[in-house]
């Protein structure tokens, strides 16, 4: 072949390769720009602090005084302190039992007492709080009267799942904020309100990261603690639970003590290839259910015929978050947040989670075709 033809033949693939390289370069630039744009969106979301979010929510109410915002901010401060102590619980030698029992007759874990003290001290200085109620205390604590500016009651479980600390399982703080009625003289009567009366609720999960879940009645929102700056940052606005997911969370060790309907439901899940996920820490189990979907159950048992979870500061705040995320919550006989409590430590059965999954439980365990759970 003549040299000219050989050169011509060689030039074609070289030209094509150059064209491909140029095209590939343009494509990479476009992809890089899109990726950077996506990263900017994520970073922008993550740079919304809890405090900024609270101020944003406050603007929904022209007459807001900022007092509720201060309470939520104070709870976030307590959460940071507790998160640090939970991470160092073994190093600081505060793991294990305190050697005493709480008002429920349950052995107190040392971190229960420490967490309770932290929250009481942080919230006790807020002039807008009239009453504090804790799982660890027999009676609600009166801080000030309504006539002295006490507009709110705060109820909380300082450290749910604390018995799991020695195995590094996720634990959490649960809280709810109620309005204080100055016309009601007794603290117990004041805090005994239906869950539907809650004005804010949330929980803090101390796990692989520290997560702060919050609702003020306008969606459920997720924040995560950035320890490098010491702030909770928004990672998910208006979280929505999946409508269904074949996952159930229940302590099957109590199966023989469940009412027949609940035993039938568990048998049904086995036949229908459901996955079982149960940690034994309510905050961790509900958080997984809220994020991934499924159903969390704590039925009545022979040992606890009225249920085991506390209505006012465990079931109600979790139900508020669940409903605001599009889920359902029931005691088995009615919507959880419609129950009128009679005492601070009142217990209740509980079923909550994805709407379709709660409906399955109600259909099998209670013979209800479809659970509307009307408000």
Tell me what each language-model feature is.
Residues 1-38:
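Polybasic, lysine-enriched low-complexity intrinsically disordered terminal tails
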Residues 106-111:
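Alpha/propeptide regions of enzymes that mature by internal proteolysis
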Residues 30-93, 100-102, 113-375:
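IMPase-like, lithium-sensitive Mg2+-dependent phosphomonoesterase catalytic core
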